Amino acid sequence: MIYIFLANGFEEVEALATVDVLRRADLKVKIVGVGSDVITGTHGISTVCDVVDSDLTPGDDIEAVILPGGMPGTLNLERSAKVNAFVDYAYENQKLVCAICAAPSILGHKGMLKGKKAVCFPGFESELEGAELSDSFVVTDGNIITAKGMGSAVKFGIAIGAAFVGEAKMKKIEESLQCS
């Protein structure tokens, strides 16, 4: 299962474009609300989640954990013990850990980016502790995928999807979305 965590103040396009792209690839994605099943994004758009974080426990079904950015959404994700437990489990078990915009800062604070190439929203670079910063819109380094921000959300989803279904299938999806 691919888990994407939403906390109040998340960046709507980063979250929902990513989910859309992954579901077009027939991947199982569960939208997890932090503290509630209805989460409001930074631009006032409310999203009904598939499940509330309190109903979940990290385990073997984790294939990937995705953290969208946005403020204060990123801060709210980082404060969540459940989000941290899922991120830690995924990282320790070599599953995908994916973060976009400000959210790579969470991985930086955990030391997960040391020696890895990574990217984030401009202004958060100092939070990516030990990372080799990139100018790319999306960066994959081992089991970590990071992306710059809202404008790279579709490419972020494409990169995550490629890890599961291959680049050829994701290229077709990208073309169908008029992104290539």
Residue spans of the language-model regions?
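Extended, subdomain-level signal for the structured scaffold at the beginning of enzyme domains
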Residues: M1-L96, I106-H109, E127-D135, T146-S180
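Beta-strand-turn-beta hairpins that frame and shape the catalytic cleft
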Residues: V139-I144
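Short, thiol/selenol-centered motifs that function as redox-active sites or metal-ligating centers
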Residues: I100-C101
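A conserved active-site-flanking secondary-structure segment within enzyme catalytic domains
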Residues: L113-V138
